[in-house]
Amino acid sequence: MKKLLKSVLVFAALSSASSLQALPVGNPAEPSLMIDGILWEGFGGDPCDPCTTWCDAISMRMGYYGDFVFDRVLKTDVNKEFQMGAAPTTRDVAGLEKDPVVNVARPNPAYGKHMQDAEMFTNAAYMALNIWDRFDVFCTLGATTGYLKGNSASFNLVGLFGTKTQSSGFDTANIVPNTALNQAVVELYTDTTFAWSVGARAALWECGCATLGASFQYAQSKPKVEELNVLCNASEFTINKPKGYVGAEFPLDITAGTEAATGTKDASIDYHEWQASLALSYRLNMFTPYIGVKWSRVSFDADTIRIAQPKLAKPVLDTTTLNPTIAGKGTVVSSAENELADTMQIVSLQLNKMKSRKSCGIAVGTTIVDADKYAVTVETRLIDERAAHVNAQFRF
């Protein structure tokens, strides 16, 4: 049985090095791996000994914490209906009637959409308080940066198509978008911002060289969106440090997307994650491979901020954006009826709330211990995310 356990854990640890896939699970035996310090010798006393003091029971560790999520499995967390203008139904421009000015409930194209890619990279300092070489209370303080990519339907990219309103009348028309642009891609990059996490880990059961342990962690960060890219044939644009409207319904202010816009705030994403895990390790001299299971719940909330396409405050050559014509029939004719009918107008998107699509995952890794004072852990996580983790620490 021991040989089988050794084989399974060693295979898992070696596999992690060749298949690097938010919060790490960590080695369940970590609280008891480093029993000596670089400044003070370890003390393996009995908690029931009346002569033992808390100074003998407590030790500190510090080190580097690196966590690299290459693909977090996420989906949107939105309502089934979305408020916007009614979809156009006329066959040609000549049949256009009044432009939509009232919102109606339509099926939300963002409902249940899966994100194509979600990445997050964190570098931090690691600090742990150890009790009786069995329990760890730890925290990390550092910086994180992220990247998100998904179908434009996940971001409710919408615009107005087939308008009868002339460019000179847009300021007072109060028109709402009527077309969902679902065949495009939206991606965003965040800045590097402060991130922190706290957690606890305990070695619950030991039998020879095997250790069964559990951990609980919480992490938080709030990066701002550094760059937003919309890759859409009908309306393609890039915004550096985008700003938008929180809690605003259509129609947006006519100045939305211009330098004169007011009432906007920076687009930022509030990241939260909870995680609980259970893992089993087996020590083989310097190496301690482990395998674990975890349950986690993550959310990315941007307050459903609505961001408008950049445009000019006043028309130049009767245009305010560089959106192309849809059918190739558009002409620039000043004050002509239907002059803007063939181009996409008042385009905007919103950053919807996202959450984990899968809650359970597995982790495999190994820890290398030197002189009972230093340790380096390498880990990979699969199923609910593809991620790699590196931790290097020493005991005082």
From Swiss-Prot:
Record carries keyword Endoplasmic reticulum: no
One GO CC annotation: cell outer membrane
Coiled-coil parts of chain: none
Keywords carried by this UniProt record: Cell outer membrane, Cell shape, Disulfide bond, Ion transport, Membrane, Porin, Signal, Transmembrane, Transmembrane beta strand, Transport
Subcellular location: Cell outer membrane
Keyword Disulfide bond: yes
Family in the record: Belongs to the chlamydial porin (CP) (TC 1.B.2) family.
Protein name: Major outer membrane porin, serovar A
Organism (species): Chlamydia trachomatis
Lineage, opening ranks: Bacteria, Pseudomonadati, Chlamydiota, Chlamydiia, Chlamydiales
Gene, per the UniProt record: ompA
